[in-house]
Amino acid sequence: MSKVIPINPTHDFKERSRQVLNDPGQRKNFRGAMDFLQAKRRAQFVDQEELQGLRELGSQIRRYSLANLPRLLELLETRLTANGVQVHWAQSPDEANAIALGIAQRVDAKRIIKGKSMVSEEIGFNHAMEAAGIEAFESDMGEYIVQLAGEAPSHIIMPAIHKTKQEIARLFADEVPGVSYTEDVDALIAIGRKVLRRKFADADIGLSGVNFCVAETGTLCLVENEGNGRMCTTVPKVHIAITGIEKVLEKLEHVPPLVSLLTRSATGQSVTTYVNMISGPRKPGEKDGPQEVHLILLDNGRTQAYADEELRATLQCIRCGACMNHCPVYARIGGHAYGTTYPGP
């Protein structure tokens, strides 16, 4: 049976909610951001029949995947192994971190560059690596901002959505050497890009999440907008991907409908800037790509949810974040009030 990370018993939801509700500026920021994201999603789904049809198709695919989960996970491991990917199974956060740490120590890694991964937040990956003397550096711009601030993400898609432009400007001026205060958004992005490019060049390992695993072909699908995911998975000599066991699909043809739902619902885009399909490490004769690819499949209570007929439906989630964007409670108090990795009522 999995060891499940408990909700932080010292976290006071009522007190944290009260603090946010007593801050008019923060309430205004949350409300404005949620209104903006809702409008972008509506613009993508003008035709309600199309929306309902796509949602039903996506639901059918996810229900089918979960109904066949044990078989698909076995097939995924077989195909990935044949492709040269090393597959690891982790029952708990401690086990997942131990696997990653073992890989890092074997290759004498000192620096890990990270793409966006909520599962890495779920297991406390950064703290585990830092405790072992290994730097874990976020490369997603939002994650980089909250890491600089010493905070957790407040939204599963937009980690720093609770930060104002002025707060980010002050954070960069205080925490990034040689940077002066500026509220120019393009300048702030350029500063972040310059720092991150150096980190990519110095990294020994790249860590990423996975949006979907395709069992039939042994493929890891990763969607993103900044290009940092592609850099994390191709520049370092070792790539470690980590995801929950529920993310498996049977066929490649199941990916496009779910990616369409994900991107249009999450950020109001027809498709993300980058769609990465990873099916193994660098082959002989190839000039780029990692020499090793590892996949850590995390349980952490998912098999318990799978065994419960009612809870099993929660495993269909594709992590688009639209429920948070439309939640009247979240829009008023944000994600930090909950004290959990995946916030919301």
Model-identified regions with their sequence ranges:
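Short, glycine-/Ser/Thr-/acidic-enriched flexible segments
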Residues: D94-E95, M118-V119, E143-Y144, K163, ...
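N-terminal leader/transition segments
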Residues: M1-S117, E121-A132, D140
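Conserved phosphate- and dinucleotide-binding cores of soluble alpha/beta proteins
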Residues: R193, R198-P281, E286
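Gly-rich Lys/Arg/Thr-decorated short loops/hinges at beta-loop-alpha junctions or inter-strand turns
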Residues: Q52-Q60, E74-N83, E167-V179, V235-P236, ...
